[in-house]
Amino acid sequence: MERKLLDLGEVQIEYFVHGSGPLVVLLPSLGRGAEDFDDVRPPLAHACCVVTPQPRGIGASRGPMSGITLHDYARDVAALIEREGGGPALICGHAFGNFVARTTATDRPDLVRGVALLGATHVWPVPPDVRESIMKSSDLSLADDERLKYLRHAFFAPASDPRVWLSGWHPEVKKAQRVATDATPQSEWWQAGTAPILDVQPESDVMCPPESQSRYRDELGDRVTIVRIPNAGHALLPEQPAAVARALLDFAARLYPAT
């Protein structure tokens, strides 16, 4: 795996490249870093060139954190794809990361072959109790036992161990990303341009209850392929990394049939 830096002037993006083949970009969840994909990346790298950027404010990535929108984060991703040959790439976004993936596909369709939604929110607005758990789960001023309660509620399947997510949080990054999301009209990114979409749904995700499972396919039609992953909640990646990798590899094989 190779570490690289992308210098865009006032913005610098640290990212990691692993493997060769079609370009696959992995974008992490709200307030979290590229390390969340550590167990997903290696199997993907057997068939793909996997790129995992650190969001602004994490690691060596830097840039304005206020007065920005999802379009600014999408520009970071687009510049990275161009730096790595222009793709077109499969962009995979986990939770918040799928907002950035969909914005990139909308703003720069020439760079995007497909979009994978990993644990995407299917209910809007997010129920107040879930939203509270999302925010408090990363509140480092709270005791671990209290944070574990919130992590279990918002992120993990009943049989999963939420302690793996006691660490890895970047509260200031999380705050900036949430503000940027609120500053971006949903209509500007919701449809992910015209790219094919893989909707990877954890079966125990509180943000994808049974009545909402077909939401994206109902709205966007045959562009959307649904894959359900058992024994996983909204966190998904630490719970079922092998299943996530398999779903992404299968989707990539459809997008890049000659490779």
Task: Give the residues covered by each predicted segment.
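Catalytic nucleophile serine of serine hydrolases
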Residues: 95
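Catalytic active-site module of serine/aspartate enzymes centered on a nucleophile-bearing elbow/loop
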Residues: 223-259
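Conserved serine/cysteine hydrolase catalytic core
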Residues: 178-219, 225-228
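Alpha/beta-hydrolase fold catalytic core
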Residues: 1-24, 46-49, 87, 156, ...
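Active-site loop/oxyanion-hole signature of alpha/beta-hydrolase fold enzymes
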Residues: 39-42, 51-92, 246
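Flexible "cap/lid" loop of the alpha/beta hydrolase fold
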Residues: 99-107, 112-142
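Conserved alpha/beta-hydrolase catalytic His-Asp/Glu region
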Residues: 126-128, 140-194
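Conserved HGGG/HGGXW glycine-rich cap/lid loop of the alpha/beta-hydrolase fold
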Residues: 11-62
